[in-house]
């Protein structure tokens, strides 16, 4: 992980995000953690080029604002927490929206991704008929399909806002495997979440946000300190070691 993919320099959004500076390296899995309202979604939307911001964001040494929306769609995929859809649109048609018109020989990758998330029987189902977990798996399949390296050589970055929402434990495990594979192929993932144990176990680097400010940035062991987490989340958070592993628990009065 020696190649810089993205650089953020004093990025801010009025009343939502304080000036923030950070680097994203190719192949990294970065988790953004922090309380509700700390700026996680705002930061991801800025990095996706969706939300106006002050400061500078460079993607592959080029200012993010210099990319057209079509160019950005080739380089990065963004999963927001909520998205409206056309209820009668079948799943297979929704997934096709994530593919560039010039791409060919995508069937193998589509089949592999659908198998990961067990979507085969839903391909002809209208998205409006899906459960919350099924819809989340469809959306995840779409963003992976958009930047999967074997069919999109320009695909580099996945920005995922709370991607584990509505997923059960086996689906989270499948997502983790797919993220790991994407990073091994040279992709980079920046995602937000609320599961401290999951982030401690899976992240290469953690950005800890509080009140719109980046209060810590580093490896999980460097960032996830009991006093720091307790202060940020305004709760008594303890590390509970079990053999060689660590588990984070919140103790409420």
From Swiss-Prot:
Domain ABC transporter, residue spans: 1-236
UniProt entry keywords in alphabetical sequence: ATP-binding, Cell inner membrane, Cell membrane, Membrane, Nucleotide-binding, Translocase, Transport
Keyword tRNA-binding assigned: no
Membrane topology type: Peripheral membrane protein
Signal sequence, start to end: none
Class of this enzyme: translocase
Pfam family, one: ABC_tran
Catalytic activity: an R-cob(III)alamin(out) + ATP + H2O = an R-cob(III)alamin(in) + ADP + phosphate + H(+)
Molecular function terms, GO-annotated: ABC-type vitamin B12 transporter activity; ATP binding; ATP hydrolysis activity
The keyword Kinase appears for this protein: no
Major subcellular site: membrane
Quaternary structure note: The complex is composed of two ATP-binding proteins (BtuD), two transmembrane proteins (BtuC) and a solute-binding protein (BtuF).
PANTHER family given in the database record: METAL TRANSPORT SYSTEM ATP-BINDING PROTEIN TM_0124-RELATED, VITAMIN B12 IMPORT ATP-BINDING PROTEIN BTUD
UniProt name for this protein: Vitamin B12 import ATP-binding protein BtuD
This protein's encoding gene: btuD
